[in-house]
């Protein structure tokens, strides 16, 4: 059984848990305290509000332990605000959080809640059929380092990338019924670790 953690401080936790429950041989685990990081094979940092999540990571004393585990190879996937937390740089903001993927992100790049949208797109690394991508006040990646692989662009903007054990997406696969992106994280990042 593969134990996949979902950071349970704020955001789309339940939605990620429900998708993970649909996948055979996967046990979703809520992660709220640093002790919850023991015995998981990967972790998802969900969408939410990045500033709030960053503060809660410190308040719950989980930031430093989680950062160390990611730096030591724990597979991690950040969706939307989770991507912001993992980025090396955040445009217009001096401080960043985990700094574990060599990207710069622009927060709320697609505008307000009213500018949220959904689109079906191909992601060749994942499947030959289109996947629904849901963007809600989404960030996008403005620059990538030399070791970062761009997985997807939408409207010329980078919305998915990976580097070593880190996967990031601007969009919310957990807000669809589709398990393919979660399976991709498990198959390519956790099983191939």
Swiss-Prot record:
Entries under Pfam families matching the protein: SNO
Keyword Lyase tagged: yes
Keywords: Glutamine amidotransferase, Hydrolase, Lyase, Pyridoxal phosphate
GO cellular component, one term: cytosol
Gene behind the chain: pdxT
Active site as annotated: 80, 172, 174
Taxonomic lineage from the root: Bacteria, Bacillati, Bacillota, Clostridia, Eubacteriales
Protein name: Pyridoxal 5'-phosphate synthase subunit PdxT
UniProt KW Chaperone keyword: no
